[in-house]
């Protein structure tokens, strides 16, 4: 199972843009600490944070060390810093190529956006009613934050498709973690519609398949306890959906399996096998 460095990650990210040397040193310490923690149990797959926003050269150095340390899962940002090129720019091809060559899984996670985490503008919450603050947690603290938490991931993944990165690196795998899952069904439809609408207005020649086919081939997603698992599995998510508990965080509830199973009374055993086991194995490219 995948282990994330949530509290320590927030401390490191606080130095981003303040002191590059301290920030990159903190990234290395973060990765080393999680490597050491997970080394006692081979079933724990720690995530090495690769700071794409620090630039290609710095990110490649961290990536090479993570590969040497034996990491199999990489955590990345979704949105590049201001005045910097997209992570889909050809400058970043060496990073995607190295990840594909090493057969590593990439994961996106709530809060790891490349900028201060704020799923909705503060102004939308200034409505005259009491509300939970956005800050101090990467978990969605209110209904509006829940609605907006996956937007950055959608944009990043759409760029990976429309800019041809998934076409160029066809075995690259990306998991979307703790950002919900129900949205991905309509998102695939919107991807295909966007491609049809703009393929004659802009150069989308690097998109050789339906955009949703890249999703099916290269993306996995985890639901929150309480989402309708059977509906997602039977409406296009059969090969996308992976079980996650979010242990020990409260978002997973004290019985995530029970919550999931309440929505799976009509789910076939082959689909359950994909949800609980096979799709995760596909993400980490395990036999």
Question: What is the role of each PLM region?
Answer:
Residues 40-46, 69-74, 102-104, 170-173, ...:
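Short, well-ordered coil/turn segments that N-cap beta-strands
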Residues 32-39, 61-64, 163-164, 172-173, ...:
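Mid-to-C-terminal alpha-helical segments outside catalytic/metal-binding sites
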Residues 47-48, 77, 109, 177, ...:
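Active-site neighborhood of phospho(di)ester-bond hydrolases with catalytic His/Asp-centered motifs
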Residues 2-3, 75, 175, 220-222:
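Structural recognition of the beta-strand scaffold that forms the well-ordered cores
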Residues 13, 114-127, 180-196, 232-236, ...:
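Histidine/acidic-residue-rich catalytic or RNA/ligand-binding cores of hydrolases
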């Amino acid at each position: 199972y995948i282990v994330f460095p949530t509290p320590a990650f927030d401390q490191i990210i606080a130095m981003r843009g303040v002191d590059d040397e301290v920030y990159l040193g903190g990234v290395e310490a973060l990765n080393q600490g999680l490597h050491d923690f997970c080394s006692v149990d081979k079933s724990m797959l720690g995530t090495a944070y690769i700071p794409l926003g620090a630039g290609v050269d710095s990110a490649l150095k961290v990536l090479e060390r993570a590969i040497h340390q034996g990491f199999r899962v990489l955590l990345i940002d979704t949105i590049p810093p201001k005045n910097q090129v997209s992570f889909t720019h050809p400058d970043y091809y060496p990073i995607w190529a190295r990840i594909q060559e090493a057969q590593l899984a990439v994961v996106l996670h709530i809060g790891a956006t490349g900028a201060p985490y704020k799923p909705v503008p503060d102004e939308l919450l200034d409505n005259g009613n009491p509300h939970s603050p956005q800050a101090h947690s990467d978990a969605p603290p209110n209904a509006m934050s829940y609605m907006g938490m996956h937007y950055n991931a959608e944009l990043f993944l759409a760029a990976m498709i429309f800019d041809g990165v998934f076409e160029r690196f066809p075995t690259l795998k990306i998991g979307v973690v703790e950002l919900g899952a129900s949205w991905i069904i309509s998102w695939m439809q919107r991807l295909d519609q966007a491609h049809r609408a703009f393929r004659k207005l802009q150069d989308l020649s690097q998109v050789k398949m339906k955009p949703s086919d890249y999703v099916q081939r290269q993306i996995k997603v985890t639901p929150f306890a309480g989402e309708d698992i059977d509906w997602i599995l039977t409406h296009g998510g059969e090969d996308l959906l992976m079980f996650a508990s979010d242990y020990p965080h409260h978002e997973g509830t004290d019985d995530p399996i029970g919550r999931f199973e309440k929505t799976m009374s009509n789910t076939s055993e082959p689909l359950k096998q994909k949800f609980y086991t096979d799709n995760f194995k596909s993400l980490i490219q395990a036999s």
